[in-house]
C-alpha cells in the first residue's frame, strides 16, 4: 500500500509539473501571444548547445511522433518524415545548405511537420522534439519558416539570425578573440586588449572591435563596399525575404497574406537590391555592375573571412577565377539553353512546360516570369510527398554551381558551402550582384515588350504637385553593438545555470544617416484617395556624366510608398525618414527584448509601437547611399496617382495601428493595382511621360568624415612597427580613408554606447 501511495504521489508530481507547464504555456496561452513568444525565444536560444531548459527537455522527450500521427492534418507528411528518420537525416553539428537536394527535401519535410500540426499544442511538442533530435541548422530554418506562415504564430517575433548563429555575420578573427576571452575567463593582458580592440565595461560585458581597417583579406577595389554588402541589417532583410517567400513552397501552402503577386514582388526585391547596390558603387566612384560572362574569368575575387561552428572556413574565390572548365562545361551549356528558352518565351509571348501553356505577354504575366526564374511551375497539385524544383529555377542553381558549391555533378551530402549558398551570406559576394543582373535582364526584356504607359495612365486629373522640399541629406558611420555570445560554448557550470556568465558583444562600423524630412505640396480639386511614391536615384554616373532617364530608371530605389487621402485645395504631405514605408530601426538585443516581454502588460501594443516591421523591414540605416564628402548629386522622383484598390480588400487593412498584427507592411502597397515600381518599371516615352502629378527634384547627399579609433589603433600597433607601410593599390584610391569605408566618429567608444552602459541598458 505504501509503495502504491509513493507511486501515485510520484505520478502526481510528474503530472503536476506538466500541468503547470501547459497551464503556463499552452492552456492559458492559447490566446496569450506573450507566452508563446517567450517559448519561441527558449527554443532558439544557444542553438549549438545541448538543451538546458528542463521544460523543453521534458516536452521533447515525452512526445512520441509515431504514436500521435492523428495530431497532424497531413498524415502522409508524418509517414514520410518517419521514413526519413529510418534512413538517416543530416546529423547535428553538420553544415546545412538548401543547395543540396537531399538536405532541401529533408528540411522541407521538417517544415511540413511543423506547419501541419493541428494546433499550437502539437506544434510546440513537435518543435521541442526536433530541438532535441535534429540538425540545428535545419531546425532553425524550418521553425523560422513555420512561425512566419502558421496562423497561430501571427505576431511572434523571432531573434535576429545574427544572434542565433553569429558565424555567418562575424569575422573569424573576432570569433577567435571571443574564444580567447572565454578560455582565459576574461583575464587578458591590457596591451593585448588594446591591440585586439577588446574593452570591458564596469558590469563585465566584453566588447570586441571588428576592425574595418584590417585589410589583409582585401583582394580588389570591390572590398571598398564591404560596409554595405556585409551589413548585418541588409543580410537579415534578404534572409527574412526568403523566409516569407521560399522558392520551394507551393502556392497552396504559402500564407494567403503573401501569396498575392508573390513572384512580382520577388522580382522587384531583387531589382531593388541591385539598384541600391549600384548607388553605393556610384558613391565610391566605381563603374556599373559588370555582367557575368560565362566565357570569361571572374576578375573580382572575394575572401569572406568567415569560419563556421565546426571549423569549416567558407572558401576564398581569388581574382580571375576561370568559370568554364572541363568539369562544368556541360552545366555552362545547360545555363545558356535555359536562358535561351526563357528569352524566346518572352519574345514569343508564351512558353509550354509539360503540356501546360503559360502566357508571357500581359502585365499580370510577370507572375509566370517570376516562377520561371526563381520558383516552381506545377499543375496546381496538392501532393506534398515530393519537393518540386523542376522547370527553370535550375537556372539560378546552375549559375551558382559554376561559381560556388556544385551540387549538380556531386552527390556529396557533407559539403563546404560558399557564401552564395546561404541566404544569410549571399549578399556579401560581389558575384551575387553579377548573377542577379544577368537574371534581371530577363525582367527588363519582359517589361520592354510591354507598351509604354500612356498619358492617361500617368496623369491624375485635378491633382498637381506644386513643390517638393528635401532636408539636407547627411550620412556617416557610427558604432553598433551586436550580441555574439551564442558563438562561444558554455562550460559545465554555465550549463547548470542555463546561461552564460559572460556577455560578449562585437562593435561594428555601420552606415547611418541624419534624420530628414520630405515635404510635398499638392493641390487637388477634389477629396480623393491616392498613392504617393518616392524614388531616389543618381543624376550622374561615376564619371560625373548625366544619365539618360531610360538607362537610369533601373537605378532608382523606392524609398517610400504610402496611401493618402487628399482634400480639396492645398495639401502638405510631410514624411519623416523614420516613418517611411517598411523600414526597421536597429533591432533590440534578444536578451533585452526578453526582459521587456516578461515585464510589459500589453504585448500587442508593444509590437505595434516598438517592433514595427521587425521581420520584414529594410534597415533604416541604409535608406540613403553613402554619398561623398563633397556631395553626391541625386534626384528624388515623387508621383501621386489615384488609388486603384484591389477588389475584395478589407479597408481596415489601411489602419497601421491595428493590433491584430495581420498587416504585412512589406506588401501594403500591393493594395494598389498598379505594378511594383510604377511608373519607372517600363520604357519611358519622354514626349508623354511628364505630367503635373509628378516631379523630379535635385538633392545632394553629403558624407560626414571624421577620425575612427579603430584606424588610429591600427596605425599605432601595426603600421609603426614596420619600415614599409602597406602600399597596396586599390583602384584609384591612395588614401586609406577611402579604402573599405570612410569611417567616422570619435577616437573612443561611441558616446551613445557609453551612455547606455552607464544607464544599465547594456550589461
Model-found features: residue ranges?
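Cleavable N-terminal signal peptides of Sec/SRP-targeted secreted and luminal proteins
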Residues: 2-17
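Intrinsically disordered, flexible peripheral segments
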Residues: 17-763
Amino acid at each position: 500500500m505504501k509503495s502504491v501511495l509513493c507511486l501515485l504521489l510520484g505520478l502526481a508530481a510528474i503530472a503536476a509539473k506538466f500541468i503547470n507547464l501547459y497551464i503556463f504555456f499552452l492552456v492559458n496561452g492559447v490566446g496569450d501571444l506573450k507566452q508563446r513568444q517567450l517559448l519561441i525565444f527558449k527554443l532558439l536560444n544557444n542553438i549549438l548547445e545541448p538543451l538546458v531548459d528542463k521544460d523543453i527537455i521534458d516536452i521533447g522527450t515525452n512526445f512520441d511522433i509515431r504514436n500521435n500521427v492523428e495530431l497532424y492534418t497531413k498524415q502522409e507528411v508524418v509517414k514520410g518524415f518517419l521514413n526519413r528518420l529510418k534512413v538517416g537525416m543530416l546529423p547535428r553539428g553538420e553544415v546545412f545548405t538548401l543547395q543540396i537536394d537531399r538536405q532541401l527535401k529533408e528540411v522541407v519535410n521538417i517544415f511540413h511537420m511543423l506547419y501541419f500540426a493541428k494546433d499550437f499544442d502539437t506544434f510546440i511538442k513537435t518543435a521541442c522534439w526536433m530541438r532535441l533530435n535534429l540538425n540545428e541548422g535545419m531546425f532553425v530554418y524550418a521553425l523560422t519558416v513555420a512561425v512566419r506562415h502558421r496562423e497561430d504564430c501571427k505576431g511572434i517575433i523571432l531573434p535576429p539570425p545574427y544572434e542565433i548563429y553569429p558565424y555567418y555575420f562575424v569575422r573569424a578573427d573576432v570569433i577567435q578573440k571571443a574564444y580567447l576571452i572565454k578560455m582565459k575567463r576574461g583575464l587578458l593582458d591590457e596591451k593585448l586588449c588594446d591591440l585586439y580592440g577588446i574593452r570591458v565595461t564596469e558590469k563585465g560585458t566584453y566588447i570586441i572591435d571588428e576592425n574595418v581597417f584590417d585589410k589583409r583579406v582585401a583582394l580588389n577595389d570591390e572590398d571598398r563596399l564591404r560596409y554595405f554588402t556585409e551589413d548585418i541589417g541588409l543580410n537579415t532583410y534578404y534572409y527574412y525575404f526568403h523566409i516569407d517567400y521560399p522558392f520551394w513552397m507551393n502556392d497552396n501552402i504559402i500564407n494567403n497574406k503573401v501569396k498575392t503577386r508573390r513572384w512580382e514582388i520577388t522580382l522587384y526585391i531583387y531589382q531593388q537590391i541591385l539598384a541600391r547596390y549600384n548607388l553605393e558603387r556610384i558613391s565610391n566612384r566605381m563603374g556599373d555592375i559588370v555582367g557575368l560572362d560565362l566565357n570569361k574569368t571572374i576578375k573580382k575575387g572575394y575572401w569572406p573571412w568567415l569560419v563556421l561552428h565546426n571549423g569549416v572556413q567558407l572558401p576564398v574565390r581569388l581574382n580571375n577565377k576561370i568559370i568554364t572548365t572541363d568539369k562544368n562545361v556541360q552545366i555552362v551549356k545547360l545555363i545558356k539553353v535555359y536562358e535561351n528558352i526563357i528569352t524566346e518565351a518572352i519574345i514569343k509571348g508564351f512558353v509550354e512546360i509539360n503540356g501546360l501553356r503559360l502566357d508571357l505577354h500581359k502585365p499580370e504575366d510577370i507572375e509566370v516570369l517570376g516562377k520561371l526564374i526563381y520558383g516552381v511551375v506545377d499543375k496546381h497539385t496538392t501532393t506534398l510527398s515530393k519537393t518540386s524544383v523542376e522547370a527553370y529555377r535550375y537556372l539560378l542553381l546552375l549559375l551558382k554551381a559554376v561559381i560556388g558549391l556544385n551540387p549538380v555533378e556531386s552527390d556529396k551530402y557533407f559539403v563546404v558551402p560558399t557564401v552564395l549558398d546561404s541566404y544569410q551570406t549571399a549578399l556579401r559576394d560581389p558575384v551575387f550582384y553579377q548573377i542577379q543582373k544577368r537574371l534581371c535582364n530577363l525582367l527588363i526584356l519582359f517589361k520592354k515588350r510591354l507598351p509604354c504607359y500612356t498619358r492617361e495612365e500617368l496623369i491624375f486629373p485635378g491633382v498637381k504637385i506644386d513643390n517638393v522640399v528635401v532636408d539636407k541629406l547627411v550620412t556617416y558611420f557610427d558604432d553598433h553593438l551586436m550580441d555574439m555570445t551564442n558563438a562561444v560554448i558554455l562550460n559545465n557550470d554555465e550549463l547548470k545555470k542555463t546561461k552564460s556568465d559572460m556577455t560578449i558583444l562585437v562593435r561594428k562600423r555601420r552606415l547611418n544617416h541624419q534624420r530628414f524630412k520630405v515635404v510635398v505640396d499638392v493641390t487637388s480639386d477634389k477629396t480623393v484617395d491616392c498613392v504617393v511614391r518616392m524614388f531616389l536615384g543618381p543624376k550622374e554616373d561615376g564619371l560625373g556624366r548625366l544619365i539618360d532617364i531610360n538607362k537610369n530608371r533601373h537605378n532608382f530605389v523606392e524609398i517610400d510608398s504610402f496611401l493618402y487621402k487628399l482634400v480639396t485645395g492645398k495639401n502638405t504631405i510631410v514624411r519623416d525618414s523614420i516613418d517611411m514605408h517598411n523600414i526597421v530601426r536597429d533591432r533590440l538585443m534578444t536578451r533585452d527584448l526578453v526582459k521587456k516581454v516578461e515585464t510589459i502588460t500589453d504585448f500587442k501594443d508593444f509590437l505595434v509601437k516598438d517592433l514595427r516591421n521587425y521581420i520584414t523591414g529594410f534597415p533604416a540605416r541604409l535608406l540613403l547611399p553613402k554619398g561623398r564628402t563633397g556631395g553626391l548629386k541625386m534626384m528624388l522622383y515623387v508621383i501621386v496617382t489615384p488609388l486603384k484598390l484591389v477588389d475584395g480588400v478589407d479597408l481596415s487593412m489601411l489602419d497601421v495601428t491595428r493590433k491584430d498584427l495581420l498587416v504585412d507592411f512589406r506588401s501594403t502597397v500591393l493594395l494598389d493595382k498598379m505594378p511594383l515600381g510604377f511608373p519607372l518599371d517600363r520604357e519611358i516615352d519622354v514626349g508623354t511621360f511628364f505630367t503635373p502629378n509628378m516631379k523630379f527634384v535635385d538633392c545632394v547627399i553629403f558624407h560626414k568624415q571624421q577620425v575612427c579609433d579603430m584606424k588610429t589603433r591600427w596605425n599605432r600597433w601595426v603600421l609603426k612597427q614596420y619600415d614599409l607601410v602597406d602600399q597596396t593599390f586599390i583602384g584609384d584610391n591612395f588614401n586609406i580613408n577611402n579604402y573599405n569605408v570612410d569611417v567616422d566618429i570619435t577616437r573612443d567608444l561611441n558616446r551613445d554606447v557609453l551612455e547606455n552602459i552607464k544607464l544599465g541598458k547594456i550589461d
